[in-house]
């Protein structure tokens, strides 16, 4: 009876044999040749998904259109969408590590580029003029009798380092005295330049030189450097038309014209003319006038010119030029005609 009361081991509790356990372990570790299951249901929903759907029914649902953002696989990557990813749900924008911002002010130099230098030419301490200055300096030192060291006699100082033995027998002891000879290469270009290029409707006169007295082109400017007053054709015609309008309006209103006033001024000028020769103090006989506007008799002027080549009144050179005084001749003719009418 005791044998029947003992519990019998079941088949489930029996331990597996050792080779079978090794086969299962090898199947779990080595999965290189495991074949995929073809009858896998992709659209099958899991239990967790069902539970999440049940919870979402009680809460407010939010629909989001999640798009897969293409990642740049190569350098030739173009995108028409925004630069930031559309899948980000956080409202705060991403901030870059470095942020640059300008002051939004125009950078204007105080000197307007007046102190700018031209750096395209050779440096002034390496050009031909500097080399020539060093040669003259060495020649001057040798001429003064500075003793040389023994090591300096065997030291090669380049093609420009030879002693100038003719330094004491010529006048060109300074670089400024021989700059026009061209013995030290081309002249130094101006380091401070201000280029100006401005043209107006009148292309034959340099506008910069006329207004400011300065031209960036200098002597090479192809336009005329003159600061005189010139009027173009359209301005002359405009002034003439305005003067004609004023003259016609004054004529219609019965106002005296400016020409009449000019005639009065000319009469006053005639009254200012001398009535006698400055030399003989008598009425004019064949009156003449010099370049300095002084009136003499013809024979008095020639007689004085033989002794003195200068004017009798102002002592300016007459250059032997005596023109006919038509104003005095005209006045003398008018006086003669009035005298004849009075008789």
From Swiss-Prot:
Domain of life, source organism: Eukaryota
Xref: CDD domains: RING-HC_RNF113A_B
The name this protein goes by in its record: Zinc finger CCCH domain-containing protein 1
PROSITE patterns registered for this protein in UniProt: ZF_C3H1, ZF_RING_1, ZF_RING_2
Source species taxonomy: Eukaryota, Viridiplantae, Streptophyta, Embryophyta, Tracheophyta
Zn-finger segments (C3H1-type): 200-228
Bias (Low complexity): 7-25, 79-91
Compositional bias of kind Basic residues: 35-44
GO molecular function list: DNA binding; zinc ion binding
Region (Disordered): 1-102, 249-268
Ranges annotated as RING-type zinc finger: 277-315
Residue stretches of biased makeup (Acidic residues): 255-268
Keywords associated with the record: DNA-binding, Metal-binding, Zinc, Zinc-finger
């Amino acid at each position: 009876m005791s044998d029947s009361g003992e519990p019998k081991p079941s088949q489930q509790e029996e331990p597996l044999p050792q080779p079978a356990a090794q086969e299962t372990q090898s199947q779990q570790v080595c999965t290189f040749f495991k074949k995929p299951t073809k009858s896998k249901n992709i659209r099958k929903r899991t239990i967790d998904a069902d539970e999440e759907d049940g919870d979402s029914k009680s809460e407010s649902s939010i629909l989001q259109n999640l798009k897969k953002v293409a990642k740049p696989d190569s350098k030739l990557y173009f995108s028409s969408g925004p630069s930031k990813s559309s899948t980000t749900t956080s409202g705060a924008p991403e901030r870059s590590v470095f942020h640059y911002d300008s002051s939004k002010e125009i950078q204007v130099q105080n000197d307007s580029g007046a102190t700018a230098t031209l750096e395209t030419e050779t440096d002034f301490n390496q050009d031909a003029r500097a080399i020539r200055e060093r040669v003259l300096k060495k020649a001057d030192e040798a001429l003064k009798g500075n003793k040389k060291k023994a090591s300096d006699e065997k030291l090669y100082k380049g093609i420009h380092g030879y002693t100038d033995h003719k330094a004491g027998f010529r006048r060109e002891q300074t670089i400024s005295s021989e700059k026009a000879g061209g013995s030290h290469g081309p002249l130094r270009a101006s380091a401070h330049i201000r280029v100006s290029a401005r043209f107006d409707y009148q292309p034959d006169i340099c506008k910069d030189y006329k207004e400011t007295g300065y031209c960036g082109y200098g002597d090479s400017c192809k336009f005329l450097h003159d600061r005189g007053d010139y009027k173009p054709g359209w301005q002359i015609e405009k002034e003439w038309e305005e003067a004609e309008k004023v003259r016609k309006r004054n004529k219609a209103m019965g106002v005296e014209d400016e020409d009449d006033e000019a005639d009065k001024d000319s009469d006053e000028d005639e009254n200012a003319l001398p009535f006698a020769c400055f030399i003989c103090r008598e009425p004019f006989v064949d009156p003449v006038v010099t370049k300095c506007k002084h009136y003499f008799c013809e024979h008095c002027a020639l007689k004085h010119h033989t002794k003195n080549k200068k004017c009798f009144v102002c002592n300016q050179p007459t250059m032997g030029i005596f023109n006919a005084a038509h104003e005095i001749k005209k006045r003398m003719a008018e006086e003669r005609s009035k005298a004849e009418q009075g008789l």
